[in-house]
Amino acid sequence: MLQWLLGLFTSSASKAASRPVDQDVAAEPPPPPFLRRESMLDNHQQVAAYVFSVETPAAMQAHAWQVSTRKFFDSVLINHFVSDKLAEVLDKRLAFLPLSPAGLEHPALDKLPRENLVIEFDPPPGAEFDRTAVLARLIALHDSGFRLGCGHALAEQGLPEALEIAQFISLGDVTNQSPPDLLARCRLLATRYPESRMVARNIDSIELYQACQQMGIHLFQGRFLTHRGARSGSKIATYRMVVIDLLNAIKRQADFDELAGIAWRDPTLAYRLLRFVNSAAMGLREKIDRLKTAMVYVGRDELYRWLTLLLFSSKKPDHLDNALRENALVRAKLAEQLAAGRMPPRERDEAFVVGILSVIDALLEMPMQEALAQLSLPAAVAEALLHRQGKYAPYLMLAIACEESDQATIKSLADELGMDAFMVNQRHIEALTWAMSFSEALEESHLGE
């Protein structure tokens, strides 16, 4: 099944030529799209959902392309979830699947799991569609066990009945709405649809996220997580400074006695490192009690990778940092996967570290240059993080583009690496499922706390 799905993303001319052409289009179908992923947080600052999309390129929005292109793109998006691989997301998070009217009718929807999958219908202003047919289809999907998400504007678009069966109601782009208007809309929707959960989109700052929390909104999507602004007078916590000192000591080849001594400056950190080495994932036959022995067993490279993750830990639980860590893990694993076959193992490890450290400015709430000044990093790593240049930059930029950019940008970056949508999407899905499983293991074992 997975191989069949991945076949949808091959870009060979022979496959394109063999596809039937829709009657309303006389040109070649669009190239297979790249999968985009965006995090959605809840009121507890935890990653509650992912939104998956394969948007229609702007250049293909002419009338002759609209219906058939949207149908094709929706088909690709739906077939991602037919795959057992991406279906793993539904074991751990909600997944929002935005569809057009044509996508709502796709026969493969019947094969999708109902648990944690949200079918979303939120047409843009002025969109034309058969309201009677769409409402009938939404009711049928609801009755078959799917959760539904609908745009609040459907009430003004002649489809208020859809909101009555929706578990989620999207408020749209909240950055374009004044606080009084947004608050009034939230109160109205909460009164009319008390069982529904409201979703805010395109939140671009932590301040807007916090303001939306006060308005009774339940789910939050936007770049606020990875684009937290620098805070005046921001200081690095003592615990994190010990981690940074350890990272720098590893890079200057300090011996293991010195590394253990640095770690014991914070007993909590030393305990976490011992707990990591003795965890089931390491497969030890006998427990290791001495920190130096544990460090020798793990080795410098693996210890360095683990310590970069411990930067996201704190003395008391911080769900926002945990959410940021999961995002960093996806970036890191995707950058590493993209570099596979193109770089030797040591450089792939550094590509992983580049992905982790790409959010250190948001984590420490200070400019990237100031944050990186604390670390002794290889020049190529610093160059990628500060200037998006050097050998690691293309892998980092493509990993970030898969969560933030449009199709044209993702394709341009993929072309630089000689990769098509099939290859990038495959690695993206693998990185996401790995990151979620890894985050879950951290939380269950308390290793990341």
Residue ranges, per PLM feature:
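Hydrophobic, Leu/Ile/Phe/Ala-enriched alpha-helical segments that form helix-helix packing faces
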Residues: 76-85, 138-142, 189-193, 339
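A conditional alpha-helix N-cap/helix-loop micro-motif detector
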Residues: 100-101, 131, 179, 252
